[in-house]
Swiss-Prot record:
Top-level taxon of the source organism: Bacteria
Residue positions binding L-aspartate: 123, 127-128
Species the sequence originates in: Chelativorans sp. (strain BNC1)
GO MF annotation: an example: argininosuccinate synthase activity
Name of protein: Argininosuccinate synthase
Length: 408
């Protein structure tokens, strides 16, 4: 166990859930430290007031609950979506992108309150411990970080439940009357892990899903929407200008009702193991489809292809916790440059889990119907030019083929 005897005051990232409530009590009883709680409102909704009440019940005097929804979407989610970031081709990074903002505020609140350290509830098996701590050290190289899951003697959630009962800490239960799934939620997504989901062959029970109706139960009629973009960011919905957080919240509602954004995946954690989770990202799934659609008519081919080549590396940096690294910032500058003319409108239909693009338009479109028409293009494109183009590109292939023929 690491020694933290010199720690007198700790800022704890506190959700009000089982893990962080036990950590709070552990910091008080084992370290004798004064605890300051910080709860970020990233759009998780009803979690917040119970977190305040539980912190008060546990004797906390300094309770910080901050509405960071606009900052979260504007400064973290939207920059990531300019890159069309997907980790391992499927994961929209809903948990990953929230950690840098939470850790940033932990470091700032520690400085504001004169705390000796910060603490988080991430386990020693997961990615979040890395994300929190890499961010903290990037912003304050001298910060002290307490990670109780790596220090205490608890080995399982059963141990946690026993500790909670011994210290009169309320334990919520899910609809099956058991200890809850491990869950995370913010304005971009919700996730569920653990219990039956630890078997990758087991179908997720329907009650696991927090954000969406089943696609099979979604309306039999499509919902049509239009999203407006400016410099790569969504700025309007159905012609109405709205703030980043408001827009994402509205897309979440639309996606929820139409069963959009569910994924069941097994991912490769940064720490080396595979994990299975059920993620729901209704608004983000719609936004990604719309952003790619507007890029399709406003981005040059070379720029678009380069972005797609760089995207996996960019997504991996976010997944692994390197939001504040120089390489992520370098890639962000390139991505942001590519978005200068990414503006216009995209029309979509939402239907039973599907996001269907039905139109896109932009004053800065590179699409030319005069060039692609099957009718008379009035000299806009001379098809005879294609012969020389093909001949030059075939030169190396013909040379290789000739050598193979000579070699028999």
């Amino acid at each position: 166990m690491a020694t933290h005897k010199d720690v007198k005051k700790v800022v704890l990232a506190y959700s009000g859930g089982l893990d962080t409530s036990i950590i709070l009590k552990w910091l008080q009883t084992e370290l004798g430290a004064e605890v300051v709680t910080f709860t970020a409102d990233l759009g998780q909704g009803e979690e917040l007031e119970p977190a305040r009440r539980k912190a008060e019940m546990l004797g906390i005097k300094e309770i910080h609950i901050e509405d960071l929804r606009e900052e979260f979407v504007r400064d973290f989610v939207f920059p990531m979506f300019r890159a069309n970031a997907l980790y391992e081709g499927t994961y929209l990074l809903g948990t990953s992108i929230a950690r840098p903002l939470i850790a940033k505020r932990l470091v700032e609140i520690a400085a504001e309150t004169g705390a000796d350290a910060i603490a988080h509830g991430a386990t020693g098996k997961g990615n979040d411990q890395v994300r929190f701590e890499l961010t903290a050290y990037a912003l304050n190289p001298d910060i002290k970080v307490i990670a109780p899951w790596r220090d205490w003697t608890f080995k399982s959630r059963t141990d946690l439940l026993n500790f909670a009962r011994d210290h009169q800490i309320p334990v919520p239960s899910d609809k099956q009357g058991e200890a809850p799934f491990s869950v995370d939620a913010n304005l971009l997504h919700s996730s569920s892990e653990g219990k039956v989901l630890e078997d990758p062959w087991s179908e997720p029970p329907e009650y696991v899903h927090q954000r969406t109706v089943s696609p099979f139960d979604a309306p039999d009629r499509a919902t049509e929407i239009t999203i407006g973009f400016k410099r790569g960011d969504a700025v309007s919905l159905n012609g109405e200008a709205v703030s980043p957080a408001t827009l994402l919240a509205k897309l979440n509602d639309l996606g929820r009702d139409n069963g959009i954004g569910r994924i069941d995946l097994v991912e490769n954690r940064f720490v080396g193991m595979k994990s299975r989770g059920v993620y729901e990202t209704p608004g983000g799934t719609i936004l990604l489809a719309a952003h790619r659609a507007i890029e399709s008519i406003t981005l040059d081919r070379g720029a678009a292809h380069l972005k797609d080549e760089l995207m996996p590396r960019y997504a991996e940096l976010i997944y692994n916790g390197f939001w504040y690294s120089p390489e992520r910032e370098m890639l962000q500058a390139l991505i942001d440059k590519s978005q200068e003319d990414v503006e216009g409108e995209v029309r979509l239909k939402l239907y039973k889990g599907n996001v269907i693009v039905t139109g896109r338009r932009s004053d800065k479109s590179l699409y030319s119907d005069a060039l692609v028409t099957f009718e008379d293009d009035r000299g806009a494109y001379d098809q005879k030019d294609a012969a020389g183009f093909i001949r030059l590109n075939a030169l190396r292939l013909r040379t290789l083929a000739a050598r193979k023929r000579l070699q028999g």
